[in-house]
Amino acid sequence: NLTKEKNVIDKNIIDEKVSKSTTELPILTEEDEQTIEVQETEAEGFEEQGIIAYNGAEKTPNIQLGEYAGLTYYSQLDNRWRHKIYSSVGNTSQTIGTSGCGPASAAMIVSSIKGNITPDQMADLYTRYGYRSPNQGTYWSAFKWTADVFNIEYSECYRLDDAINKLKNNNYIIASCNQGLFTYGGHFIVLVGIEGNYIKIYDSYLYNGKYDVASRRGKAIVKGYTTYVSIQDFRQYANYRKFFCFKNNRTDTK
């Protein structure tokens, strides 16, 4: 019974004393979501291009982070950056709002472990160093590069059970998902914790009513900026492809 389980979550699980840089969720529709650029999740040539970008990119750019504020949520639809161009080919219709789940997810990870960096700053880095594909979102290799640049312990896995073990071991995880519970095309989401039988998710394309549509109803619980999905439903409906894991080794976690 989802209503009963929601009450359990409300009483026992949700305790979010976190600093969130995004302060309100946007009001969008299912139709709006269906018009965004599809983030590639599995094409072999796409992955090869990402590897080429990684092998050719500088790994030690001097980047100044802001103050560490603990677990941080960013919406790619935040008005401060949603209309900023995120394109490697000068396409002004490619913005952080339409195409920026990759840099938004990575910005959440780095801000939550090291210090503040915003989605538009991360998007500029990805474009500058070759991790923005022409028409298919962000290359997967951007995340390994991000871990290199910001000195974060990093690993990858494909099995959900392995990802859950990583979550239990103080990792934040970017999950690449194909068409399913979280997206109509392809999308990156951030797994920030595990509470009981629920995975805690930061979705940069979360909007009011996203999980009220027929195909998603009853499969997710939204509380504030966090989406809770049971492990069973994630396994069945997320259509996940790969997990990019970042270890939080801080001892002063907020």
Per-region residue spans from a language model:
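Active-site-adjacent structural segments surrounding the nucleophilic cysteine of cysteine proteases
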Residues: 1-131
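Solvent-exposed, well-ordered amphipathic alpha-helical segments
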Residues: 51-55, 63-64, 76, 140, ...
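Cysteine-dependent hydrolase recognition
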Residues: 94, 103, 112-139, 153-156, ...
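Stable alpha-helical elements in mature extracytoplasmic
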Residues: 97, 102-106, 118, 122, ...
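Active-site-adjacent substructure of cysteine-protease-like catalytic cores
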Residues: 153-206, 210
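Noncatalytic regulatory segments and standalone regulatory/sensor domains
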Residues: 194-254
